[in-house]
Amino acid sequence: MHRIYTFLIFISQLALGLSNNPDIPIQYELANNIMENYQKGLIPKVRKGSPINVTLSLQLYQIIQVNEPQQYLLLNAWAVERWVDQMLGWDPSEFDNETEIMARHDDIWLPDTTLYNSLEMDDSASKKLTHVKLTTLGKNQGAMVELLYPTIYKISCLLNLKYFPFDTQTCRMTFGSWSFDNSLIDYFPRTFTNGPIGLANFLENDAWSVLGTKVNREEKKYTCCPVNYTLLHYDVVIQRKPLYYVLNLIAPTAVITFISIIGFFTSVNPFTNFCNVSSSVHDLRQEKITLGITTLLSMSIMIFMVSDKMPSTSTCVPLIALFYTLMITIISVGTLAASSVIFVQKLGSIGNPPASKTMKWTHRIAPFVLIQMPLVMKQAYAKRAKEEKHRKRMSRKNSMWTKVYHLARDHSKLMETVPDGAVKFNQISDFKNNDIGNMESPRMAESQTSETFAAPMDTSFTESLHIPELNRVASSNSIQSVLKPTEIQLTPYCTRNIVELEWDWVAAVLERVFLIFFTICFLFSAIGINLYGWYIWYTENHFLF
């Protein structure tokens, strides 16, 4: 028994000597003192009904990734949590006026601050916890604990891609205690001069810009628990920089579509000389179907590039998807329209001329679409009109010779039946002055000065009239040769090519109408959609905050 008592005295003296050893740092003595009766697994709460107030502050350092298909935001931030630990406190005068001390994070109690919408369940993968800073508030008053740590938050964010790539997204981070209600732990945000989330050390992102931040404190009651839980909602408003998509996707697609429209409905020298038609409708319009199919294939590649950026959602149609849909529709319908132009042109090879109503509407529309009738077609019309005029003139001549024939026949009968005497030849003289005088015969022109007269009916009557044609028509063979119709007709090859010219002109006018129509549709679709998206992007950028 005496030996045991001696050993205890020795141990106490040794401990006292170590405590008074001036070589031991004051932090060691302070740590041993405050941790002597500390239980890090229990909440450091002394007074009942008074929760531990945790102040949370965030500083955004970098936006790492915005993943549209998987709907999450990956960012790097610096977090600071502050609270008063009532079990950690000391009198600075007892420890050489030491007011601060650094301790390991796993030596003290930490609040279970949880990011509710985190996609990473392991805190060690998102937080880098090292040390905590303890600042005493006085003996039996506790100490202010500051936990500073860098973190990478992978948060779920419901992205609204309606105006993609001119979109603005708001991603929310919800913080709170997972185990303690607000009767034990209560949360409060700490704001900065430039907003609830600090941006002083933020690194600019090439694809996104931060428009602003917001914070909202909410006390929410769950059905499982009778007491409310405190939640802090941090909203980060980011806006996409659309330059990449405009230059690499939208602009090339618009250029390809516009060039395709021009290629569909623009002909090169569609008319050549008469009776030797070689329209580009024959040669070039056949390639327009291939052009349309090739353009659609190139569009499918670009759509594949865009689809990688899109989530599989049916809630809305992104603006860029609407843009590509309209471009594909324009090219598809344009290909069908080009086929209809080819069909109209091919009607000329059948040989049937266009209907008069078709030509009438073509003549009306042509000036509005700035299509003039080709010179070769005007020459063909002029030549056909000249031949028609010549045919009518020859028809009138044949009609006059028929009158001469009947007059000569009546004259012969008159000579046989009428006795000698004076006879008036008013009809003969009138016919000479009105009809025969218009005939293109020099010999007939000699008798145009005759007037109504009376002459004896003798054998010299025909000679006194100076109308040898009356003697010529006395022969039936001569009369039949005069009455034979004389028509000047075009060769079948030339006649067919006149029809082809007409159908080519109808096709050219229809082609120009399609060109104007599809150009207007392209301008409204391409420029209109992108201007609308840019307007939304600009207004949110300047008027959101």
UniProtKB/Swiss-Prot annotation:
InterPro entries linked: Neur_chan_lig-bd, Neur_chan_lig-bd_sf, Neur_channel, Neuro-gated_channel_TM_sf, Neuro_actylchol_rec, Neurotrans-gated_channel_TM, Neurotransmitter_ion_chnl_CS
Pfam families in UniProt? Neur_chan_LBD (PF02931), Neur_chan_memb (PF02932)
Q: Does the keyword Signal apply?
A: yes
- Tissue localization of expression: Expressed in the body wall muscles that are arranged into four longitudinal bundles, some mechanosensory neurons, the head muscles and multiple interneurons. Not expressed in motor neurons (at protein level).
Where in the cell?
Cell membrane
CDD domains attached here? LGIC_ECD_nAChR (cd18997), LGIC_TM_cation (cd19051)
List the GO molecular function terms: excitatory extracellular ligand-gated monoatomic ion channel activity; transmembrane signaling receptor activity; transmitter-gated monoatomic ion channel activity involved in regulation of postsynaptic membrane potential
Mapped to this chain, the residue ranges on the Cytoplasmic side of the membrane are 338-512
Q: Where are the transmembrane segments?
A: 245-265, 287-307, 317-337, 513-533
Which residues are reported to be glycosylated?
N53, N97, N228, N276
Q: Phenotype of the disruptant?
A: Mutant worms are morphologically similar to the wild-type but exhibit mild swimming defects and are lethargic with their movement being interrupted by frequent pauses when crawling on a food-free environment. On the same environment, in other occasions they display decreased rates of spontaneous reversal and steering, and slightly increased average speed. Homozygotes are fully resistant to monepantel but heterozygotes are partially affected by the drug with reduced fertility and slightly impaired movement.
The residue ranges for the Extracellular side of the membrane come to 20-244
The record gives the membrane topology as:
Multi-pass membrane protein
Q: Where is it mainly found?
A: membrane
Determine the domain of life of the protein's source: Eukaryota
**Which segment of the chain is annotated as a signal peptide?**
1-19
Q: Which SUPFAM superfamilies match?
A: Neurotransmitter-gated ion-channel transmembrane pore, Nicotinic receptor ligand binding domain-like
Query: What's any one GO cellular component for it?
Result: transmembrane transporter complex
**One example of a Gene Ontology biological process annotation:** monoatomic ion transmembrane transport
Q: Keyword annotations for this protein?
A: Cell membrane, Disulfide bond, Glycoprotein, Ion channel, Ion transport, Ligand-gated ion channel, Membrane, Receptor, Signal, Transmembrane, Transmembrane helix, Transport
Cysteines engaged in disulfide bonds, as pairs: C157-C171, C224-C225
Q: Which family does it belong to?
A: Belongs to the ligand-gated ion channel (TC 1.A.9) family. Acetylcholine receptor (TC 1.A.9.1) subfamily.
Q: What is the role of this chain?
A: Betaine receptor that functions as a ligand-gated non-selective monovalent cation channel in mechanosensory neurons to maintain basal levels of locomotion. The channel is permeable to Na(+) and K(+) but not to Ba(2+) or Ca(2+) ions. Elicits current in response to betaine, very weak current in response to choline, virtually no current in response to acetylcholine and nicotine, and no current in response to glycine and GABA.
Q: What other facts are recorded?
A: Suppresses snf-3 mutant phenotype growth defects. Elicits no current in response to the broad-spectrum antiparasitic medicine ivermectin. This channel is allosterically sensitive to monepantel, an anthelmintic of the amino-acetonitrile derivatives (AADs) class, leading to muscle paralysis upon treatment with monepantel.
State the protein's name: Betaine receptor acr-23
Organism listed in the record: Caenorhabditis elegans
